[in-house]
Amino acid sequence: MKTKHFCWLDREFIEISAEGRAGVAADIATAELFEKFETELKASGLSLDNTARIRVWGRDKDARTLATAARSKILSGNRKAASSSFISSEWFDSDGTAGLELLAMRSANPSAVRRPVDFEPGRNYLCYLDYDGLSFFSGFTSEAPVLKKQVAEIVATISTALERGRTDWSRVVKLSVLLQRGHDLDVVRRELASAGRAAIREIEFTLVDGFAGEKYLLEIEATAVK
């Protein structure tokens, strides 16, 4: 398990990542990881209630599905956070089949209230989380037939979500792009530029093997200030 403490946007964050125990089903391994993460967070005066973003990793499709189901059970109700899930064998250093990356935040305002906002109609993951003046958006995807069209559709989806969250692109501070291995990062960069989104303060890229949907070629997460 790796734990990192850092300050960002005038707030304190804790990032925890770990691979699940090998030799057990992915949902069981995921539940065990959440227990370990809770213990780690409590050592700093936080808990899973402070989760802002959660990424689920599966070695294969079945592992991702099981791990995501476990996440949905544990981070439910007001504990819901911005979420995404991916398939990537290269993410793992062990023989485990499930892993988690969790981002928790200590709010600058002790009276700040977490406001999870669901999709309409609801899905098994959150649309976005409003928390102490920040908005954490789940990973958005597209089923368009080619990569450049998927980027364009996702940018449009994020635009709609930003409007719903009463913020806008000028307040987006970070985009995380997770791209299907074998596809061209430059295509994504060009499409973001053509949409006028290439000047965002921080854009990071990660290669993965797959997503929840067979047609998805990328997934984009956004973080914005209010």
Regions found by a protein language model. Give the residues of each.
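N-terminal presequence-like segments and the immediate start of the first folded domain
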Residues: 1-173, 179-226
